[in-house]
Curated annotation (Swiss-Prot):
Encapsidates the negative strand viral RNA, protecting it from nucleases. The encapsidated genomic RNA is termed the ribonucleoprotein (RNP) and serves as template for transcription and replication. The RNP needs to be localized in the host nucleus to start an infectious cycle, but is too large to diffuse through the nuclear pore complex. NP comprises at least 2 nuclear localization signals that are responsible for the active RNP import into the nucleus through cellular importin alpha/beta pathway. It comes from the Viruses. The lineage of its organism: Viruses, Riboviria, Orthornavirae, Negarnaviricota, Polyploviricotina. It comes from Influenza A virus (strain A/USA:Albany/12/1951 H1N1). Residues 8-21 have a biased composition (Basic and acidic residues). The keyword Ribonucleoprotein applies. GO terms for molecular function: RNA binding; structural molecule activity. This is Nucleoprotein.
């Protein structure tokens, strides 16, 4: 990928590291995982959870959320300055599920944030360990990406629901740092920028004064993050114009929407990381596994091996299908919400079906849901093969971006040729080519139109047997490419914004 040399690798983003070699990166990522695991073990002790209850993904989510809330400084400050009825700004908590008399019971727990911070720091050798917090945020974000299709949010910002494959990381908090920025899709960045520009249009003081200066710096930083995701000179030049605009307004919004559309074909580079729930790391650490000593990577075989040997349970509502619940969580663990279903199915070794055909709602249980009818079951998170996670958008042809798949953003570096109907796609670009960026727009359209079929194929490595830890013998699966295997299309997934 172009200019990859100037960027830090994932794991460096993950650990805020200076330049490190592969071994150091594996060790520091391992250290982060150890910290999450130790924290989880300690929380299970505090909450007196049995082994089974500690492996329940709903309990894991509550515990993760508690520590994220305890460290959310901006929100904590806000809560202290704007006290609201019934909310103690110094406390955090949530539902914990326990098995009592052969039934699942919900218990609401409340802890001092200070106490949670103490337990977290203690598990992380006294550090704040922000990398570990970000890791949990990305896991929650991947779970949201898999569970909800953000049609409404897209429509609100004037984008098209067909762009949902660009929306990775759309629920990540702003404070998720470099590692968070790396996993955000082009559409997510465009949406954040459009929201900002709209505020500026409606509030004339938004760009003014001391606060306005900070706003402006944030705007330019977001523009640069988005620019870094594009792989063609024309797209980047257009981002420079958006960034340098004196007074961002509707023209910039138009340009951003155009760029988002172009990203359906000229794919941006978006990182993919396998972030697992804390209830996977906890038992592994408890069993004596030393992640720091052994080393760990979020983009290689390690998460696959870990899931191969983990037992995770989930509460199941009366009319839900446990196999479908497993697929939802498997996709979240592998950051595969926007991957081609055929590729995912091949790697998983069982058919992965579209969101609309899944008989399952989200993983979290609302506080008003009846617990009497809740069952629990084992989540099947194992895979048949493993593959390297990609960050290129799948175009490795000599520094020049080529066309990608429309309704997916590749997660796995697996070779495939693409069903690619240029006419359908180019239809999205008829119309508005005037304005300051008309020449750039024309250039971007030209690049898309001239993408040759052989450039349209995705040059990936292939998949590997789980025994092939060094990725020595790639298996290149052949797919029936008559149609695209999109997870979200032709269906009615729940909305995140409900």
């Amino acid at each position: 990928m172009a200019s990859q040399g100037t960027k830090r690798s994932y794991e460096q983003m993950e650990t805020d590291g200076e330049r490190q070699n592969a071994t150091e990166i594996r060790a520091s990522v391992g250290k982060m995982i150890d910290g999450i695991g130790r924290f989880y073990i300690q929380m299970c002790t505090e909450l007196k959870l049995s082994d089974y209850e500690g492996r329940l993904i709903q309990n894991s989510l509550t515990i993760e959320r508690m520590v994220l809330s305890a460290f959310d400084e901006r929100r904590n400050k806000y809560l202290e300055e704007h006290p609201s009825a019934g909310k103690d700004p110094k406390k955090t908590g949530g539902p914990i599920y326990k098995r009592v008399d052969r039934k699942w019971m919900r218990e609401l727990v409340l802890y001092d944030k200070e106490e949670i911070r103490r337990i977290w720091r203690q598990a992380n050798n006294g550090d704040d360990a922000t990398a570990g917090l970000t890791h949990m945020m990305i896991w929650h974000s991947n779970l949201n990406d898999t569970t909800y299709q953000r049609t409404r949010a897209l429509v609100r910002t004037g984008m098209d629901p067909r762009m949902c494959s660009l929306m990775q990381g759309s629920t990540l908090p702003r404070r998720s740092g470099a590692a968070g920025a790396a996993v955000k899709g082009v559409g997510t960045m465009v949406m954040e920028l459009i929201r900002m520009i709209k505020r500026g249009i409606n509030d004339r003081n938004f760009w003014r004064g001391e606060n306005g200066r900070k706003t402006r710096i944030a705007y330019e930083r977001m523009c640069n993050i988005l620019k870094g995701k594009f792989q063609t000179a024309a797209q980047r030049a257009m981002m420079d114009q958006v960034r340098e605009s004196r007074n961002p307004g509707n023209a910039e919004i138009e340009d951003l929407i155009f760029l988002a559309r172009s990203a359906l074909i000229l794919r941006g580079s978006v990182a993919h990381k396998s972030c697992l729930p804390a209830c996977v790391y906890g038992p592994a650490v408890a069993s004596g596994y030393d992640f720091e000593k052994e080393g760990y990577s979020l983009v290689g075989i390690d998460p696959f091996k870990l899931l191969q040997n983990s037992q995770v349970y989930s509460l199941i509502r009366p009319n839900e299908n446990p196999a479908h619940k497993s697929q939802l969580v498997w996709m979240a663990c592998n950051s595969a919400a926007f991957e081609d279903l055929r590729v995912s199915s091949f790697i998983r070794g069982t058919k992965v079906i579209p969101r609309g055909k899944l008989s399952t709602r989200g993983v979290q249980i609302a506080s008003n849901e009846n617990m009497d009818t809740m069952e629990s079951s084992t989540l099947e998170l194992r895979s048949r093969y493993w593959a390297i996670r990609t960050r290129s958008g799948g175009n490795t042809n000599q520094q020049r971006a080529s066309a990608g798949q429309i309704s997916i953003q590749p997660t796995f570096s697996v070779q495939r040729n693409l069903p690619f109907d240029k006419t359908t796609i180019m239809a999205a670009f008829t119309g508005n080519a005037e304005g300051r960026t008309s020449d750039m727009r024309a250039e971007i359209i030209r690049v898309m139109e001239s993408a040759k079929p052989e450039e349209v194929s995705f040059q990936g490595r292939g998949v590997f047997e789980l025994s092939d830890e060094k990725a020595a013998n790639p298996i290149v699966p052949s797919f029936d490419m008559s149609n695209e295997g999109s997870y979200f299309f032709g269906d009615n997934a729940e909305e995140y914004d409900n």
